[in-house]
Amino acid sequence: MNNEKILTRWIVEKLGLDKLEVITSDMLEGYTSIGNGAFAYHNTLTSISIPNSITSIGNEAFRECISLTSISIGNSVTSIGHDAFKDCYSITSITLPNTITSIGYYAFCGCYDLTTINIPSSISKISMFAFMKNRNIKNVVIGDKNYELQTVVNSKCKAYKAFNADLTCRGFQYEEGKTYEMDENPELCIRGFHACLNLLDVFNYYNGVFGEDVVVHEVELDGVSDEKNKGNSKVVAKKITIGKRIL
């Protein structure tokens, strides 16, 4: 028996939820998923609490909710669809529950006021452009796991700061079309944190983002400067290690 109950845009409008500034968890209790585009372009929404009955947030579910500042995501959500919170300019922080396993492409793209992201250890897939254009991110918190990955940084690339000085990882940028081993073989897609302009110390490389040839002047692998990989050479990081504290 299928007990799925989707909160669709039609239901949102029928219940008058599209007219509210604050939506509490009891208003959504009993639904199992927030459907595609359910609250998209709801310009007056400032706060929403997603109850534990919800297991998934659909594509474009909250796209361009430009006044949204506060999100509480219940402890049953396992997936966030593509563009789910795209261009929610006013969000300042995100804490994802330990049940989340995947974040879709462009999910938090354009959240300009976002300064902190908490990514739990349950995450197995962060899709391309998931946090693109988040120019004010200062802290990324990764769950309590140590990851060993392979990455390739191309020679003609634009360097963006990513994470902070304590992180041993260098280059949160992955070669397109490949799957990288991380614990139980999760997949991290190309440019997961592309265009995070103001992050600290660790570079996120992107090939030709503005059509200009920006040379890599210094690359650090496992926290040690690699003199051999200056200039136009291809940079291959043998190991990326992500610690278990604020990075």
Each language-model region and where it sits:
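N-terminal capping/linker segments that flank leucine-rich repeat
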Residues: M1-G37, I50, N136-T179, E184-G192, ...
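Intrinsically disordered, low-complexity, compositionally biased regions/tails
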Residues: L20, F39-Y41, F62-E64, T78, ...
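Consensus positions within tandem repeat domains that build extended binding/scaffold surfaces
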Residues: I11, G35-A40, G58-R63, G81-K86, ...
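Structural signature of tandem-repeat unit edges
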Residues: M1-I6, K14-S33, N43-S56, I66-S79, ...
